[in-house]
């Protein structure tokens, strides 16, 4: 999560995680395009607008939605987990961009890592909490 110079352009890094998804996010000065694993964001997320809106939400909070391109390498989990991981990664990259961005992003909840994950299966049960059918006699 550091700023690096690439071809005379500043690149800001952020990593986000959600469930089993991990997203490594780069912010590059540009026009607001989202690229995930080499594909346009709307193609990767099957044109589900909520995912793209969520990804761009931290930028919109700061009024920077058309100033940075978002380049993402995401793996693990499903589309919802990856979209939330990207959102966290974008917010962390914006904190690298300027430390004063931290307070508005934190107050909106974009810097909070969602700790919920799948609960492990226990022996003697069918799933994490589903018990076999009880028979009184």
From Swiss-Prot:
Any one cellular-component term (Gene Ontology): cytosolic small ribosomal subunit
SUPFAM superfamilies in UniProt: Ribosomal protein S5 domain 2-like (SSF54211)
Region (Disordered) location: 104-137
One of the record's GO molecular function terms: structural constituent of ribosome
GO biological process per UniProt: translation
Highest taxon of source: Bacteria
Annotated keywords: Ribonucleoprotein, Ribosomal protein
InterPro entries given in the database record: Ribosomal_Su5_D2-typ_SF, Ribosomal_uS9, Ribosomal_uS9_bac/plastid, Ribosomal_uS9_CS, Ribsml_uS5_D2-typ_fold_subgr
Compositionally biased spans, kind Basic residues: 118-137
Family matches, as Gene3D superfamilies: 3.30.230.10
Family: Belongs to the universal ribosomal protein uS9 family.
Record-given protein name: Small ribosomal subunit protein uS9
Organism the protein comes from: Gloeothece citriformis (strain PCC 7424)
């Amino acid at each position: 999560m550091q700023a690096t110079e690439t071809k005379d352009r500043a690149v800001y890094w952020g990593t986000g995680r959600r469930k089993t998804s991990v997203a490594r996010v780069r912010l590059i000065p540009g026009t607001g395009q989202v690229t995930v694993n080499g594909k346009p964001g709307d193609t990767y997320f099957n044109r589900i607008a909520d995912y793209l809106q969520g990804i761009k939400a931290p930028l919109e909070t700061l009024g920077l939605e058309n100033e940075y391109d978002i380049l993402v390498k995401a793996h693990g989990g499903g589309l919802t987990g990856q979209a939330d991981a990207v959102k966290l990664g974008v917010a962390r990259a914006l904190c690298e961009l300027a430390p004063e961005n931290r307070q508005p992003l934190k107050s909106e909840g974009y810097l909070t890592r969602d700790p919920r994950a799948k609960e492990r299966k226990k022996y003697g049960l069918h799933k994490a909490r589903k018990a076999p059918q009880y028979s009184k006699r």
